[in-house]
């Protein structure tokens, strides 16, 4: 299906260079990009609905970053505000039967639970079906861990190595076994 990537902190030249390094000169009409979008509650909802109507085979929308689409507010962000924002995006994804990936930043300070390092309140995670947290020990490291939590899957930690040639992350190993659907007990008999 079609993928929409809202690269709201990039420009088209950077995207073109990145795609060329990742995939060569071959393109696809299934991957769409935008470098600007309206805010949630101020037109983004309509933009995304229009995209889905024009591309009914859409399966994934990536919004990079959440902060760029947040409603403009003079109020400090609260748990309720964060929960409402993610809740609106989740309702949109559920209604359209797509996966929505919201990219967000982490704080610099360490925390007992790595997911507490996500910038903002716990409301961001409270409403989401799952979260990925990519971390490196140092900014210049070529190795990282990807911690995954979700409602419908076991927690996982993946160890990755950066592939600078393809600008991707390669899986080294998983600390926990990747999720497998349990066998149907009725089919075993």
Predicted segments — roles?
Residues 164-189:
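DNA transaction DNA-binding modules
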Residues 4-6, 60, 79-171:
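Phosphate-binding/switch region of NTP-binding enzymes
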Residues 1-84, 91, 173, 180-184:
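Conserved inter-motif catalytic segment of the P-loop NTP-binding fold
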């Amino acid at each position: 299906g079609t993928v929409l990537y809202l690269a709201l902190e990039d420009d088209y030249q950077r995207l073109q260079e990145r795609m060329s390094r990742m995939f060569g000169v071959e393109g696809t009409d299934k991957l769409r990009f935008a470098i600007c979008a309206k805010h949630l509650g101020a037109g983004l909802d309509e933009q995304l609905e229009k995209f889905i109507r024009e591309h009914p085979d859409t399966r994934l929308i990536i919004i990079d970053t959440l902060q760029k689409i947040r409603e403009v507010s003079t109020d400090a962000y609260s748990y309720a505000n964060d929960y409402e924002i993610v809740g609106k995006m989740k309702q949109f994804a559920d209604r359209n039967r797509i996966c929505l990936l919201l990219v967000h930043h982490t704080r610099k300070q360490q925390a007992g639970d790595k997911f507490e390092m996500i910038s903002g309140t716990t409301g961001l995670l409270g409403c989401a079906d799952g979260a990925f947290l990519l971390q490196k020990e140092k900014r210049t490291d070529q190795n990282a861990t990807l911690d995954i939590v979700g409602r419908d899957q076991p927690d996982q930690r993946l160890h990755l190595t950066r592939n600078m040639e393809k600008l991707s992350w390669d899986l080294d190993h998983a600390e926990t076994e990747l999720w497998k659907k349990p066998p149907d007990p009725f089919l075993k008999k």
